[in-house]
UniProtKB/Swiss-Prot annotation:
Pfam families: Asp_decarbox (PF02261). It is an enzyme of class 4 (lyase). Substrate binds at residues 57, 73-75. It comes from Xylella fastidiosa (strain 9a5c). Belongs to the PanD family. It catalyses: L-aspartate + H(+) = beta-alanine + CO2. Is synthesized initially as an inactive proenzyme, which is activated by self-cleavage at a specific serine bond to produce a beta-subunit with a hydroxyl group at its C-terminus and an alpha-subunit with a pyruvoyl group at its N-terminus. The gene is panD. Its main location: cytoplasm. Its cofactor is pyruvate. It comes from the Bacteria. CDD domains: Asp_decarbox. This is Aspartate 1-decarboxylase. Binds 1 pyruvoyl group covalently per subunit.
Amino acid sequence: MQLSLLKAKIHRATVSHSELNYEGSIAIDGLLLEAAGLYEFEKVHIWNVTNGARFTTYAIRAEHGSGIISVNGGAARYVQVGDLVIVAAFAQMSEDEAAVFSPNLVYVDAANAMTHTNHSIPTQVA
């Protein structure tokens, strides 16, 4: 059986640009792209924390260290500059692979500068 597990997440990034007339995609600061282990043109899910919108697109590289998170093309209709978003990608793997796998989790500040990384999410308690 193949399972779909979270591969990578950039948590609560701030949308810095929204370019309706640019070729579709989400441009992500190259530093964040690399830290998350995301590839250019990889399918990503975007979850808008600010308004609840959810959509998929593909990642492209923005300037390294720029803090750019730019939602482009038709997807720009789902965000506004200043919105908080989560960028996530999933990977297919066997149960054996899943048993030893851990995702790349990237956390950023309000300027999209990386604050820290992790490979697990703390257990939620009541």
